[in-house]
Curated annotation (Swiss-Prot):
Modified residues (N6-acetyllysine): 163, 167, 259
Chain coiled-coil ranges: none
Modified residues (N-acetylmethionine): 1
Role according to the record: As part of the heterotrimeric replication protein A complex (RPA/RP-A), binds and stabilizes single-stranded DNA intermediates, that form during DNA replication or upon DNA stress. It prevents their reannealing and in parallel, recruits and activates different proteins and complexes involved in DNA metabolism. Thereby, it plays an essential role both in DNA replication and the cellular response to DNA damage. In the cellular response to DNA damage, the RPA complex controls DNA repair and DNA damage checkpoint activation.
The protein's name in its UniProt record: Replication protein A 70 kDa DNA-binding subunit
Keyword Repeat: no
PANTHER family: OS03G0429900 PROTEIN (PTHR47165:SF4)
InterPro entries: Euk_RPA1_DBD_C, NA-bd_OB-fold, NA-bd_OB_tRNA, Rep_factor-A_C, Rep_factor-A_N, REPA_OB_2, Rfa1
Keyword Ubl conjugation: yes
Single GO molecular function: zinc ion binding
Length: 616
C-alpha cells in the first residue's frame, strides 16, 4: 500500500520549497490549535510513506472537511495547493489550501508502511529501514484502486479557485524601506512573537479618517482590511502614520507591508477573521506590488438571511442578497454631534425567501442605485434586534454590487428563474407595511390560525386575498373631534356645540369616523377583522363624511352601500395580536391596509406556489 503515497514528497517540500507538486499523503493525526473566537485551525501529522512531518497546517476553508470527519486520521488525500512558510528560525510550515480526500479513514483503516519522522535539521530525510524480503508478493506495489473521489474536494469560500487565487504564493523576497530583504509570509502565519516579517496583501477596504480630541490634543486614525491567499487581517494607522500612508494606499491595490505591531484583535469592531490585528508604527513600510493577479479580493463568510435570527445583537456578519426593493434617501440629524446624515433602507432577499432590512448611511445612502435589482455582498454589517432582525451597514463595512463570485451567480440565476415572483417573508420590522410595500408575508386564513400567528409577545403581520361576506353596520360610525390630529369622540351638548374632552374645547361641528367590523373569508377559513377609517372607506367605496350624511338623510341608500360591498374581494394587510380582557384571551385582527386584487399578479403567485408544492 506504500505505493499509493508520493514517497519523497515531504523531503522535496522541506528541502526545495517545491509548491508545484500535488503529492498524495496520508493523515496520521489531527489536532486543533487554539485560536480564540476565530474559526479553529488544525495541525496535521502527515506521511508520504517514507517520512512523517507534523508541520502541516490547514487553512480555515478546509475546516468543514475536518468537522464532517472526511479529513481524519488514516485517510489518504491529494494536496492540490499549498504554501510553504519559512519561520525566522529557519523551520518551514506547510499551509494546506486545497486538498481532495481520495480514500476515507474507514477504507484505509491503518497507517500505511513504516514511515519515520523527517528530521529537518539534518537537511536530509530519514529513510525507513527496508522490510525483510519475505516473499516477492510482499515487495510488489499494488496499483491505486479506482475508488470514488471523496466529497473532500474544496472550493474557496467566496471565489472560484481558478478565477481568484490563481497560482500558489510560495516564499518570495521583497525589499523593505531599510534596503534589507525579508521573506514574504502568509497573513495566516502572523503572530505577535514575530519581529521581522513582510506580507503581500490586497487592500479590500479603506476607511475614512476619523478624528477626535482628548487631553493629548487632536488625534486621528484610519483602518484597512488586507487579504492574501491564506487569510485576512485588519490594520490601523494613527496620527503621523495617517499623514504618511493615507494618500498612498488605494483600495484593491496590492502592497508589501512590513514591520507593523501585532496585537490581539478586538472582535467587537471588525468582521475580519483573524485573532490578531496590525497597527502601523514608525518602522512600518508599505511598498506597491506590481504582480497582483494571484491575490484574492474581499473574503466573505456569508450568513444566510434566515440564519440572522440566530445571531446575537451587535454581532458583525457578511451577507449576500438581491436588492428586492429600496426606499428613497432621507436626511436625519445625529443627536450626538447634531450633524445631518443621509439614511436609506434597502431590502435584501436570498434563496431562503426571507427578506432583511439593511440601512445605508451617508455617502453609501446617497449614491446607492437599486433600480436593476443588483446582487449585493456586504462584509461586516451589524445585526440589530429592533422589531425583528435588521442590518446596519457601517463605515467599516464593504459593499460590492454584483460581485464576481459563485454565490452571486447562483443567487442571480435563482432570482431570475423564480425568486422575482416571490414577495418574501421579512425578518425585520413589518409595521411600515413590509418591503417597500412589497413584502407582504402571504398567508391563507387557515394558515394564520394553524400557525398560531399573533400568539407571541409581538404582533404578527400578514396579507391575504379574501372576500367580504358580512359587514356589521351597527355602531360603525361616531362623531369625532373636528381637529386634524384628534379623533376623540365628542359629546353632544344639546345646544349646537360638541365637546372634545381630550382637547378640552367645544366645537360647532364634528367629523364622522368609522370603526367597521367585517367578516372576511377565503377558500378555507373566515376571520372577523376590525377596519378603521381608511380601510373601511376602501371597502365601502365611499368616504365617512358622505356616509354620515347618507345615514342621517337616506337610510335605504345607506343600507345599499353596505349591501354592495358584500362579496367583493380585496388584498387585506392584517395585524394580529392576542389580547386579554376580563381574564379572557382572544386574537384581535386589525386591518392595516386594503387594496384591490391584481389578478394577473395573484395568478402568477398561485402558479409559483403550485410549482413549489410540486417539488416537495
Amino acid at each position: 500500500m506504500v505505493g499509493q503515497l508520493s514517497e519523497g514528497a515531504i523531503a522535496a517540500i522541506m528541502q526545495k520549497g517545491d509548491t508545484n507538486i500535488k503529492p498524495i499523503l496520508q493523515v496520521i493525526n489531527i489536532r486543533p490549535i487554539t485560536t480564540g473566537n476565530s474559526p479553529p485551525r488544525y495541525r496535521l501529522l502527515m506521511s508520504d510513506g517514507l517520512n512523517t512531518l507534523s508541520s502541516f497546517m490547514s487553512a480555515t476553508q478546509l475546516n468543514p472537511l475536518v468537522e464532517q470527519e472526511q479529513l481524519s486520521s488514516n485517510c489518504v488525500c491529494q494536496i492540490n495547493r499549498f504554501i510553504v512558510n519559512t519561520l525566522k528560525d529557519g523551520r518551514r510550515v506547510v499551509i494546506l489550501m486545497e486538498l481532495e480526500v481520495l480514500k476515507s479513514a474507514e477504507v484505509v483503516g491503518v497507517k500505511i508502511g513504516n514511515p519515520v519522522p523527517y528530521n529537518e535539521g539534518l537537511g536530509q530525510p530519514q529513510v525507513a529501514p527496508p522490510a525483510p524480503a519475505a516473499s516477492p508478493a510482499a515487495s510488489s506495489r499494488p496499483q491505486p484502486q479506482n475508488g470514488t473521489s471523496g466529497a473532500g474536494s474544496t472550493v474557496s469560500k467566496a471565489y472560484g479557485a481558478s478565477k481568484t487565487f490563481g497560482k500558489a504564493a510560495g516564499p518570495s523576497l521583497s525589499h523593505n524601506s531599510g534596503g534589507t530583504q525579508s521573506k514574504v509570509v502568509p497573513i495566516a502565519s502572523l503572530t505577535p512573537y514575530q519581529s521581522k516579517w513582510t506580507i503581500c496583501a490586497r487592500v479590500t477596504n479603506k476607511s475614512q479618517i476619523r478624528t477626535w480630541s482628548n487631553s493629548r490634543g487632536e488625534e486621528k486614525l484610519f483602518s484597512l482590511e488586507l487579504v492574501d491567499e491564506s487569510g485576512e487581517i485588519r490594520a490601523t494607522a494613527f496620527n503621523e502614520q495617517v499623514d504618511k500612508f493615507f494618500p498612498l494606499i488605494e483600495v484593491n491595490k496590492v502592497y508589501y507591508f512590513s514591520k507593523g505591531t501585532l496585537k490581539i484583535a478586538n472582535k467587537q469592531f471588525t468582521a475580519v477573521k483573524n485573532d490578531y490585528e496590525m497597527t502601523f508604527n514608525n518602522e512600518t513600510s508599505v511598498m506597491p506590488c506590481e504582480d497582483d493577479h494571484h491575490l484574492p479580493t474581499v473574503q466573505f463568510d456569508f450568513t444566510g438571511i434566515d440564519d440572522l435570527e440566530n445571531k446575537s445583537k451587535d454581532s458583525l456578519v457578511d451577507i449576500i442578497g438581491i436588492c428586492k426593493s429600496y426606499e428613497d434617501a432621507t436626511k436625519i440629524t445625529v443627536r450626538s454631534n447634531n450633524r445631518e446624515v443621509a439614511k436609506r433602507n434597502i431590502y435584501l432577499m436570498d434563496t431562503s425567501g426571507k427578506v432583511v432590512t439593511a440601512t445605508l448611511w451617508g455617502e453609501d445612502a446617497d449614491k446607492f442605485d437599486g433600480s436593476r435589482q443588483p446582487v449585493l455582498a456586504i462584509k461586516g454589517a451589524r445585526v440589530s434586534d429592533f422589531g425583528g432582525r435588521s442590518l446596519s451597514v457601517l463605515s467599516s463595512s464593504t459593499i460590492i454590487a454584483n460581485p464576481d463570485i459563485p454565490e452571486a451567480y447562483k443567487l442571480r440565476g435563482w432570482f431570475d428563474a423564480e425568486g422575482q415572483a416571490l414577495d418574501g417573508v421579512s425578518i425585520s420590522d413589518l409595521k411600515s407595511g413590509g418591503v417597500g410595500g412589497g413584502n407582504t408575508n402571504w398567508k391563507t386564513l387557515y394558515e394564520v390560525k394553524s400557525e398560531n400567528l399573533g400568539q407571541g409577545d409581538k404582533p404578527d403581520y400578514f396579507s391575504s386575498v379574501a372576500t367580504v361576506v358580512y359587514l356589521r353596520k351597527e355602531n360603525c360610525m361616531y362623531q369625532a373631534c373636528p381637529t386634524q390630529d384628534c379623533n376623540k369622540k365628542v359629546i353632544d351638548q344639546q345646544n349646537g356645540l360638541y365637546r372634545c374632552e381630550k382637547c378640552d374645547t367645544e366645537f360647532p361641528n364634528f367629523k364622522y369616523r368609522m370603526i367597521l367590523s367585517v367578516n372576511i373569508a377565503d377558500f378555507q377559513e373566515n376571520q372577523w377583522v376590525t377596519c378603521f377609517q381608511e380601510s373601511a372607506e376602501a371597502i365601502l367605496g365611499q368616504n365617512a363624511a358622505y356616509l354620515g350624511e347618507l345615514k342621517d338623510k337616506n337610510e335605504q341608500a345607506f343600507e345599499e352601500v353596505f349591501q354592495n360591498a358584500n362579496f367583493r374581494s380585496f388584498i387585506f394587510r392584517v395585524r394580529v395580536k392576542v389580547e386579554t380582557y376580563n381574564d379572557e384571551s382572544r386574537i384581535k385582527a386589525t386591518v392595516m391596509d386594503v387594496k384591490p386584487v391584481d389578478y394577473r399578479e395573484y395568478g402568477r403567485r398561485l402558479v409559483m406556489s403550485i410549482r413549489r408544492s410540486a417539488l416537495m
